[in-house]
Amino acid sequence: MLYHLAMVLETFYSGFNVFQYITFRTILGVLTALGIALMIGPAVIQRLVLHQVGQQVRDDGPETHLEKAGTPTMGGALILVAIAVSTLLWADLTNRYVWVVLLVTLAFGLIGGVDDALKLARQDSQGLRARTKFSLQVLAALAASTFLFATATDPVETSLVLPLVKEWVFPLGLGFIALATLVIVGSSNAVNLTDGLDGLAIMPTVLVATGLAVFAYASGHHVFADYLGIPSVPGVGELVIFCGAIVGAGLGFLWYNTYPAQVFMGDVGALALGAALGVVAVAVRQEIVLFIMGGIFVMETVSVMIQVLSYKLTGRRVFRMAPLHHHYELKGWPEPRVIVRFWIITVVLVLIGLAMLKVR
């Protein structure tokens, strides 16, 4: 909104021309989202406490988690407000990608919010039925994927792009819709599985969003895209502002979510943030890079799949508990050690992902 106002005012004062620069608006987007999260955080937490919106803890989880019972949850709503306001203020609202990523994020946030609300109403850790939640996620992702496919103006927008090799671009046709839906839903649930310790999910989300912002900026600028040998996707540069909003909102939330957490994001935040990363990766045609940079999310998801499959086939568990972070907790690692080491791994993976911009 302010971006469009600035473009009108530019006719009266040339200084407003600075708002045309994506980098400038991204900085404003980060600061706006960060400021909103920090300012309204205490009020949101206080209201959650007042209405007894407390975390339900599984009885079969690590004993150290029992003390987390009652900690305010659904703090992810704070993140979504900060992201939405910041994006609406500083992004170009005539850009289709901006609306796709924003609506997907809010749709998955709504699904997560209903799930959280049911858990609170029933006073247990079971919310929406798994089949119902998954179906709603698929519908939301399918709608976004179909829209992107139908509005694509260049074949590369619906092709599979493999990193490291310039020429490896494979047209997917209708397969794009299936791949995009899988990435969005998979990313959403992967972040949700990772959200089990204080600050564990939010910092990797911030780091991956930062990495995707670099790809979005390069892909949206045809000169940079040609130089780096990555697909040039007109319009995706505006997603840098959205990614910046995720970074700002995430850091603001981490202020209250760091160990020991004053608030948890809940499914309303985790499902939404995961979907946001997934849909941005789809838009910039970097699904495989997301798989690499978000390796922690992948590890957590795979650990659950291995655990379930092993138990069903052999009756034995590979890990002491899944997802993976609980395994290390039960091995005796203090919670902060698990969190920070997972953060460090994510930093390394994001750097590897960014290195693929040059290694081609």
Curated annotation (Swiss-Prot):
Keyword Cell division recorded: yes
Reactions catalysed, as given in the entry: UDP-N-acetyl-alpha-D-muramoyl-L-alanyl-gamma-D-glutamyl-meso-2,6-diaminopimeloyl-D-alanyl-D-alanine + di-trans,octa-cis-undecaprenyl phosphate = di-trans,octa-cis-undecaprenyl diphospho-N-acetyl-alpha-D-muramoyl-L-alanyl-D-glutamyl-meso-2,6-diaminopimeloyl-D-alanyl-D-alanine + UMP
UniProt keyword list: Cell cycle, Cell division, Cell inner membrane, Cell membrane, Cell shape, Cell wall biogenesis/degradation, Magnesium, Membrane, Metal-binding, Peptidoglycan synthesis, Transferase, Transmembrane, Transmembrane helix
Topology of this chain in the membrane: Multi-pass membrane protein
PROSITE patterns noted in UniProt: MRAY_1, MRAY_2
Segments passing through the bilayer: 26-46, 73-93, 98-118, 136-156, 168-188, 199-219, 235-255, 263-283, 288-308, 338-358
Pathway field: Cell wall biogenesis; peptidoglycan biosynthesis
Keyword Transmembrane included in the entry's annotation: yes
Pfam families hit by this protein: Glycos_transf_4, MraY_sig1
Cofactor requirements of the protein: Mg(2+)
Its EC number(s): 2.7.8.13
Compartments in which it is found: Cell inner membrane
MF (Gene Ontology): metal ion binding; phospho-N-acetylmuramoyl-pentapeptide-transferase activity; UDP-N-acetylmuramoyl-L-alanyl-D-glutamyl-meso-2,6-diaminopimelyl-D-alanyl-D-alanine:undecaprenyl-phosphate transferase activity
Assigned GO CC terms: plasma membrane
InterPro entries: Glycosyl_transferase_4, PNAcMuramoyl-5peptid_Trfase, PNAcMuramoyl-5peptid_Trfase_CS
One record GO biological process: regulation of cell shape
Location (main, coarse): membrane
Role, per record: Catalyzes the initial step of the lipid cycle reactions in the biosynthesis of the cell wall peptidoglycan: transfers peptidoglycan precursor phospho-MurNAc-pentapeptide from UDP-MurNAc-pentapeptide onto the lipid carrier undecaprenyl phosphate, yielding undecaprenyl-pyrophosphoryl-MurNAc-pentapeptide, known as lipid I.
NCBIfam families the record matches: mraY (TIGR00445)
Family: Belongs to the glycosyltransferase 4 family. MraY subfamily.
Protein name: Phospho-N-acetylmuramoyl-pentapeptide-transferase
